[in-house]
């Protein structure tokens, strides 16, 4: 496969970035509002809607990595070059932001000594969103072995996807029925299916593109049904109300996440085909996505402090205005920092 840029994946990355932001925007009112609030259901629905973002980001990262390296992989030399680029370049911003968020947590009254900080750094727990970076680092470390396995099974895609699903299901069953795994969100195997599916897609993305075009209406239908089920079950669990499907919550959220990956890939194809301002905006967000991802929780924390109010109307306005303002500022700050020699230590290269 030629190493051409796949613009649909840039649009997809922008969608994932905005979804992560919306998830963090909506989680705050879900946590502070009374369940009797008129708008509580709206915030809870938006938050539940965003539950596919990390899975989609992992799928995307795996697809991009295979697309970038599969045809030019030369064994150990390629592995070392890939690790230098993919571990060090994002690793330094990760450490810097872990320090920043640790200082923010200390300022809010949390006691964190140096050994605790090292544990937070290793597990991505310095702030709620940083565990994703740890997941990606694990995938990068295992990538040479996984790529070799993928090449052996590329002609048997169903088996490859089945192995990914079994790894993920096995992790879940072990955690639920054998031994509660510490920091379960920080283990890449928890999302094994999405990584395996992304790697398979990266081998020949045109195949997936053609399939989603042919089946776009079926994908949309499955996505809509799974979205409703995900939101209703998530709401029932959050509110502690009975729901006949509560026992299948893990399965439902995974069906929803898979359907969302396919649905928003189809949306990305449509946006790319239009080739208008939505695509240009998506490309801009995609190019700044790492900086936006790392910095936006700090922006949201500052915004909430500046706009704190007891007025219900102003509170709701500030929630949604904060999403727009923080996206714009983190995007602009990323572009600005990239102009400087050492700006990459904050926003990546």
Language-model features: where?
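Aromatic-anchored segments of alpha-helical transmembrane domains
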Residues: 22-25, 163-176, 223-236, 298
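Alpha-helical transmembrane segments and terminal signal-anchor/GPI-anchor hydrophobic tails
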Residues: 208-288
């Amino acid at each position: 496969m030629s190493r051409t840029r796949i613009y649909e994946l840039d649009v997809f990355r922008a969608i994932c970035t905005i979804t992560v932001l919306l998830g963090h925007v909506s989680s705050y009112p879900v946590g502070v509002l009374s369940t009797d609030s008129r708008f509580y259901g709206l915030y809870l629905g938006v938050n539940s809607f965003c539950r596919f973002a990390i899975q989609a980001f992992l799928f995307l990262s795996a697809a991009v990595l295979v697309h970038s390296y599969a045809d030019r992989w030369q064994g150990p030399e390629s592995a070392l070059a890939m690790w230098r680029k993919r571990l060090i370049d994002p690793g330094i911003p990760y450490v810097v932001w872990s320090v920043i968020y640790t200082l923010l947590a200390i300022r809010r009254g949390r006691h964190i000594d140096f050994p605790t900080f090292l544990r937070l750094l290793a597990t991505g727990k310095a702030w709620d969103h940083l565990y994703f970076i740890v997941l990606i680092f694990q995938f990068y470390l295992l990538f040479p072995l996984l790529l070799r396995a993928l090449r052996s099974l590329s002609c048997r895609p169903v088996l490859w996807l089945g192995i990914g699903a079994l790894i993920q299901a096995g992790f879940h069953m072990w955690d639920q029925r054998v031994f509660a795994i510490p920091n379960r969100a920080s283990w890449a195997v928890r999302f094994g299916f999405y990584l395996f599916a992304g790697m398979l897609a990266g081998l020949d993305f045109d195949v997936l593109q053609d399939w989603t075009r042919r089946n776009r209406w079926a994908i949309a239908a499955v996505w809509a049904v799974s979205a409703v089920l995900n939101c209703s079950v998530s709401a029932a669990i959050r509110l502690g109300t009975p729901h006949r499907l509560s026992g299948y919550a893990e399965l439902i959220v995974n069906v929803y996440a898979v359907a969302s990956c396919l649905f928003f890939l189809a949306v990305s194809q449509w946006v790319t085909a239009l080739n208008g301002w939505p695509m240009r905006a998506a490309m801009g967000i995609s190019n700044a996505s790492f900086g936006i991802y790392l910095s936006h929780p700090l922006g949201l924390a500052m915004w909430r402090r500046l706009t704190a109010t007891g007025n219900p109307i102003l509170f709701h306005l500030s929630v949604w205005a904060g999403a727009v303002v923080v996206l714009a500022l983190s995007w602009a700050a990323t572009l600005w920092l990239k102009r400087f020699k050492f700006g990459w230590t904050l926003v990546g290269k």
